[in-house]
Amino acid sequence: MNTMLFFCFSSKDRHSIVESILFHLTNYGLPVWYDRHKMLLGDERDNKNFDEGVKACNYSIIILSANTIASECANEEIDLIYQRYKQHKMYVFPIFFNIKASQLPEKYCWMKRLVYKELTVANDSRSACNHIICKVTLDELQKYKIKTINEYLKLYKNNKAFSYLTELIDSYCKISDENHNAQIALLYAGCLYIKEKYNCCLEIPEFYYKGIKRLFEETRLNLPIDLRETLIFERLFLLLFNAAIFGYTI
């Protein structure tokens, strides 16, 4: 099964919150099953939404609001998502929009057992998206040999074939934890080197490398970067390295 996120929401929330979250996720190149991109007039809804949508995805984002609770279509999706969650076939990211966890009807209280995010129109949805990207990249790394920077150094520190990357990583590890822009600049240099030397981007998922440019642009414009975004960049670097050296693993 390919990594893909199913987006469950009420169409009434599309412009107020859904498209903001979609914007951030697609900026990272994450594959999202989004009805406007996947469904056309005349399509068989159950087949497209359930078989090609929910059942084909291993992650789901549920935007739960008063509108979602009142939506028959969204509730059909939530019922199937819950089944797959109980079968350990789907990881769920609950986002409560304009509703408190304490206000949820009994049917939806299972989501309160998960780490959830409460958002309003006034909140920045980027933080919630960073949680999602952190989880997806962490899971993706489990497919590969090198899962952490320390594992890379343990295996390749004295390997002359990777001396340039090792020097970058050594410098990265010596930077203050608060200096996120400098950390990202070094990781970006390493990613550019890997892409140029191994020409691997044609064979790997877009989200392995698209977020690299997006995060670097934030540092170039001197936008604030936090620890979670630095962690995302570190994982993207490791994904790119693993795929280049060992080959992409589905």
Regions found by a protein language model. Name each.
Residues 1-59, 82-83, 90, 171-250:
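Conserved N-terminal substructure of TIR/SEFIR domains
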Residues 17, 86-97, 118, 144-160:
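A short, terminal or domain-edge coil/loop segment
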Residues 22-141:
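Cross-kingdom TIR/SEFIR domain
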Residues 120-123, 127, 156-163, 181-185, ...:
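Alpha-helix boundary/N-cap detector
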Residues 131-170:
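Charged, amphipathic alpha-helical linkers/stalks
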